Amino acid sequence: MKIQLIAVGTKMPKWVEEGYKEYSRRFPKDMPLELVEITAGKRGKNADITRILQKEGEAMLAAVPKGNRIVTLDIPGKRWDTEQLAEQLEAWKLDARDVSILIGGPEGLAPACKAAADQSWSLSPLTLPHPLVRVVMAESLYRAWSITANHPYHRE
């Protein structure tokens, strides 16, 4: 199974790139973590945010390979603790589909992305900066994998 993070935004700060790479490189070959960056729409004083979200959503959904499970990150989504995420990872593996996790930009996800989702996951009730979410996602997914593989990374 491949896990794909589809995230709005390019040109992230160096610490974001390094943090993401640190965890993504640890994934086993049979479960690679791939990042697909979607160019963010231009935001300014008179920007049409609805139109920007629509365009970003179209680009995100176009990046999802046919047949992939779509999981959106959204505050009202289901909350999983680490063990529940590990269980979810196992369920995804049994489903025999690759997984695309959609991470929105500053205003969140387009309605079309939410409508296309097979699942919606709330990473936190807090509003997190979208660059930070990439690092948190990579670490959380790696930790969940480590539990399923009985790897010593996760300690209770």
Curated annotation (Swiss-Prot):
Would I find S-adenosyl-L-methionine among this entry's keywords? yes
Q: Where does it localize? A: Cytoplasm
Does the keyword section mention Cytoplasm? yes
Protein EC: 2.1.1.177
- Keywords linked to the UniProt accession: Cytoplasm, Methyltransferase, rRNA processing, S-adenosyl-L-methionine, Transferase
- Report residues binding S-adenosyl-L-methionine: 73, 104, 123-128
Q: Which GO terms describe its cellular component?
A: cytoplasm
Q: Which reaction does it catalyse?
A: pseudouridine(1915) in 23S rRNA + S-adenosyl-L-methionine = N(3)-methylpseudouridine(1915) in 23S rRNA + S-adenosyl-L-homocysteine + H(+)
**What's the main place this protein lives?**
cytoplasm
Single GO MF annotation: rRNA (pseudouridine-N3-)-methyltransferase activity
Which InterPro entries does the UniProt entry name for this protein?
Alpha/beta_knot_MTases, RlmH-like, tRNA_m1G_MTases_N
A Pfam family: SPOUT_MTase
| Function field | Specifically methylates the pseudouridine at position 1915 (m3Psi1915) in 23S rRNA.
What protein family does this chain belong to? Belongs to the RNA methyltransferase RlmH family.
Subunit details: Homodimer.
Q: What is the protein name stated in its UniProt record?
A: Ribosomal RNA large subunit methyltransferase H
* Native species: Aliivibrio fischeri (strain MJ11)
Q: What lineage, starting at the top, does this entry show?
A: Bacteria, Pseudomonadati, Pseudomonadota, Gammaproteobacteria, Vibrionales
